[in-house]
């Protein structure tokens, strides 16, 4: 699993039938800043994920990849490799609060 920030959406009018009705979002993975371990920073990479929790633009989310992405009831029969499974409220690392959704 990893943390990511929702950066956008993907619309595909031509796709396999099993993906019809599923929201696709772009996300940028986050990591602890190696120069300032009190904050999260983007990695510069982009992933497309199926959203199973109703996430929105700018939210910090929890992502699973690979076979784990197909273990939710919503995705078990989908050809996906990355799934949003949670919207993050807080992140604490080494006793420090790195993220709090209430203060963003």
Segments (PLM) and residue ranges:
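Short, surface-exposed secondary-structure boundary micro-motifs
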Residues: 9, 30, 66-67
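Short, structured beta-strand/loop micro-motifs enriched in basic residues and often containing a Trp
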Residues: 39-47
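C-terminal structural segments of small proteins and small subunits
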Residues: 62, 68-104
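Short aromatic-glycine-enriched beta-strand elements
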Residues: 19-27
């Amino acid at each position: 699993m990893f943390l990511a920030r929702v950066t956008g959406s993907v619309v595909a009018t031509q796709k396999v039938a099993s993906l019809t009705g599923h929201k696709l979002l772009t996300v940028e993975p986050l990591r602890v800043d190696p120069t300032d371990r009190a904050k999260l920073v983007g990695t510069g990479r982009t992933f497309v994920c199926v959203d199973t929790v109703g996430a929105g633009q700018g939210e910090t989310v929890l992502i699973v990849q690979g076979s784990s992405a197909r273990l939710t009831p919503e995705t078990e029969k989908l050809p996906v490799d990355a799934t949003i499974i949670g919207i993050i409220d807080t992140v604490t690392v080494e006793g420090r609060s790195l993220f709090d959704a209430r203060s963003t």
